[in-house]
From Swiss-Prot:
Catalyzes the 2-thiolation of uridine at the wobble position (U34) of tRNA, leading to the formation of s(2)U34. The keyword Metal-binding does not apply. Belongs to the MnmA/TRMU family. This is tRNA-specific 2-thiouridylase MnmA. Keywords: ATP-binding, Cytoplasm, Disulfide bond, Nucleotide-binding, RNA-binding, Transferase, tRNA processing, tRNA-binding. It comes from Anaplasma marginale (strain St. Maries). It catalyses: S-sulfanyl-L-cysteinyl-[protein] + uridine(34) in tRNA + AH2 + ATP = 2-thiouridine(34) in tRNA + L-cysteinyl-[protein] + A + AMP + diphosphate + H(+). GO terms for molecular function: ATP binding; tRNA binding; tRNA-uridine 2-sulfurtransferase activity.
Length: 387
């Protein structure tokens, strides 16, 4: 079928499919599209194919459908089928990349171990760091890809001769938080065609392109955690990690008993099953003692945090006086002004200008307004030094 953009598709010029490789026309450019089986990546593949690019679809098989992973999850059999169906209908090749073993080792096992350490992990970032932007990019090069395109809602621009990431234009769909660990070398190979579009417009494009997945709901869960039931996944995959322990107040009083620290996250208020004259929150998870520490909201808020494995886009040396940044501590949270100083070897200290909830295992992602600077993993310095 011949693709002719309608006025609705142009969206006042925001649909920008300029040559993905400078100086190389579409018909000579091979684009490997990371297809999850969802609407966004399917639209990317369809638009590039109809624009004349040599498109190859690639879908990662990350897990089998099982009680632990769930049948309704991303990168499972249903999603692979949907991606193959889109590729077959449009007429471009599609490959399935079996990363089940490495995904279990580097993402699921890390997820389990993170909870055992009393952290709150972000497996989607770990997946980006490993199977998606390490292994998949390697496979894309091996099959002759010039670039890899994804359905992420971020913008890729060149600033002062360096490739940079800007937040997606749609603030409700911006995914820059999850890409803080992308390296400068990987970014040279990546393309994000949807960064200037709103999700509603992408849905409209899918309908106008008659894609079979046009009405497919967005995935809301961690791909191997169906219906956000991560506790069930932990019980199935590592039963020994779920054991009873004490709930204590920050002042040392014993308040009750818990059925596993993996059932709690820092900042949690509901589900503590203890009575008190004022609201109590999870302030800290002491994995060494298998103890949940709770207290008033004032004990929860912090002005400083510590990060490790810092990644910068592009590579950057923090001035000795520190660097003023906008810091985001949650994927859906607002940014706060902060200053980061280097502690050497990829470690840093971030001082916030506002009180915030700080959860070890989450990411502290750094921005200069719209521009993604990089980020690192929040860690408990006392536990780290005592390890």
């Amino acid at each position: 079928m011949q693709f002719i953009p309608s006025p609705a598709m142009v969206f006042d010029g925001s649909l920008n499919l300029d040559p993905l490789v400078s100086g190389k026309p579409p018909e000579e450019t091979t684009v490997v599209v990371a297809m999850s089986g969802g609407v966004d990546s399917s639209v990317v593949a369809a638009l590039l194919h109809e624009r004349g690019y040599k498109v190859i679809g690639a879908t990662m098989q990350l897990h089998s459908s099982s009680p632990a992973s769930g049948a309704k999850s991303c990168c499972g059999s249903v999603d692979i089928y949907d991606a193959k169906r889109v590729a077959s209908t449009l007429g471009f090749p599609h490959y399935v990349l079996d990363y089940e073993e490495v995904f279990r080792r580097e993402v699921i096992d890390d997820f389990i171990n993170s909870y055992k350490r009393g952290e709150t992990p972000i497996p989607c970032v770990k997946c980006n760091q490993t199977v998606k932007f390490r292994d998949m990019l390697k496979a894309a090069r091996a099959i002759g890809g010039d670039v890899v395109a994804t359905g992420h809602y971020v913008r890729r621009v060149e600033i002062a001769g360096e490739q940079q990431i800007l937040r997606g234009k749609d603030p409700q769909k911006d995914q820059s938080y999850f890409l803080f660990s992308v390296t400068s070398e990987q970014l040279k190979f990546l393309r994000f065609p949807l960064g200037d579009l709103a999700k509603s417009n992408v849905r409209l494009l899918a309908q106008q392109l008659n894609l079979e997945v046009a009405d497919k709901p967005d995935s809301q869960d961690i791909c191997f955690v169906p219906e956000n039931s991560y506790r069930e996944v932990l019980r199935n995959l590592d039963p020994a990690s779920v054991k009873k322990g004490k709930i204590v107040h920050v002042d040392g009083r014993l308040l009750g008993e818990h059925d596993g620290i993996s059932n709690f996250t820092v900042g949690q208020r509901r589900g503590l099953n203890i009575s008190a004259p004022y609201p109590l929150y999870v302030v800290r998870l002491d994995a060494a003692q298998n103890t949940v520490v709770v207290g008033p909201q004032s004990a929860l808020m912090k002005r400083a945090l510590f990060v490790k494995n810092l990644n910068w886009l592009p590579d950057y040396n923090i001035p000795k006086r520190g660097l003023a940044v906008d810091a985001r501590l949650r994927s859906s949270g607002a940014t706060v002004r902060a200053t980061i100083t280097s502690d050497g070897d990829g470690y840093g200290t971030v001082v916030l200008e506002e009180d915030c909830v700080v959860s070890p295992g989450q990411a502290c992602v750094l921005y200069d307004k719209e521009r993604l600077l990089g980020g690192g993993w929040i860690y408990n310095k006392l536990c780290h030094e005592g390890a």
